[in-house]
UniProtKB/Swiss-Prot annotation:
GO terms for molecular function: mRNA binding; structural constituent of ribosome. The lineage of its organism: Bacteria, Bacillati, Actinomycetota, Actinomycetes, Micrococcales. This protein is one of the early assembly proteins of the 50S ribosomal subunit, although it is not seen to bind rRNA by itself. It is important during the early stages of 50S assembly. It comes from Pseudarthrobacter chlorophenolicus (strain ATCC 700700 / DSM 12829 / CIP 107037 / JCM 12360 / KCTC 9906 / NCIMB 13794 / A6) (Arthrobacter chlorophenolicus). InterPro entries: Ribosomal_uL13 (IPR005822), Ribosomal_uL13_bac-type (IPR005823), Ribosomal_uL13_sf (IPR036899). It holds the Pfam family Ribosomal_L13. CDD domains: Ribosomal_L13. This is Large ribosomal subunit protein uL13. The gene is rplM. One of its GO terms (biological process) is translation. It comes from the Bacteria. SUPFAM superfamilies: Ribosomal protein L13. Keywords: Ribonucleoprotein, Ribosomal protein.
C-alpha cells in the first residue's frame, strides 16, 4: 500500500473566526497555529500548505497571565546600529494589539518558507467587526481553564 500524498487541488480550505475576548494569548496562538498549518486535518503533510484561513476578532481584549503584562517585552530592530527598541506588553496591547497577537502566532509557526504563506492566511482585527462575512466563517471555540 502506498502512502497518500495530497495534491494541491485536493486541499479544502475553510474559514474560522475566533473571538479573543479573555482568551490567554499563548493558548490562542497555539490553537491558531494548528489551524493555519492544517494539523487538524487527516491529510496533513508537513511539506505543503494545508491550513485554513483564520480570522481573530477582539484582539484588544486578549489576556496575559501572571506578571507578563508588565514583565514580558517585545523587541524589534530598525537595522541600524543601536536601533534595538523594546516595549512591554501592556503598552503594546494598548497601542497595537494586532501586532502582539500576530507576533505570538508567528513564533509558533515553523521557521521555514511555508511560514510566510501560512501567516498570510491569518487576519487579525482589533474590534468585533471583520470584512470577511462573504466567506461564511465558522466559529472556533477555544476551551479555557478558569483563571
Amino acid at each position: 500500500m502506498r502512502t497518500y500524498t495530497p495534491k494541491p487541488g485536493d486541499i479544502n480550505r475553510q474559514w474560522h473566526v475566533i473571538d479573543a475576548t479573555d482568551v490567554v494569548l499563548g493558548r490562542l496562538a497555539s490553537q491558531t497555529a494548528i489551524l493555519l498549518r492544517g494539523k487538524h486535518k487527516a491529510t496533513f503533510a508537513s511539506h505543503m500548505d494545508m491550513g485554513d484561513f483564520v480570522i481573530i476578532i477582539n484582539a484588544e481584549k486578549v489576556a496575559l497571565t501572571g506578571a507578563k503584562l508588565e514583565q514580558k517585552r517585545a523587541y524589534r530592530h530598525s537595522g541600524y546600529p543601536g536601533g534595538l527598541t523594546s516595549v512591554n506588553y501592556a503598552e503594546l496591547l494598548e497601542s497595537n494589539p494586532v501586532r502582539a497577537v500576530e507576533k505570538a502566532i508567528k513564533g509558533m509557526l515553523p521557521k521555514n518558507s511555508l511560514a510566510a504563506q501560512q501567516l498570510g492566511k491569518l487576519k487579525v482585527y482589533r474590534g468585533a467587526e471583520h470584512p470577511h462575512a462573504a466567506q461564511q466563517p465558522k466559529t472556533f471555540e477555544i476551551t479555557q481553564v478558569a483563571q
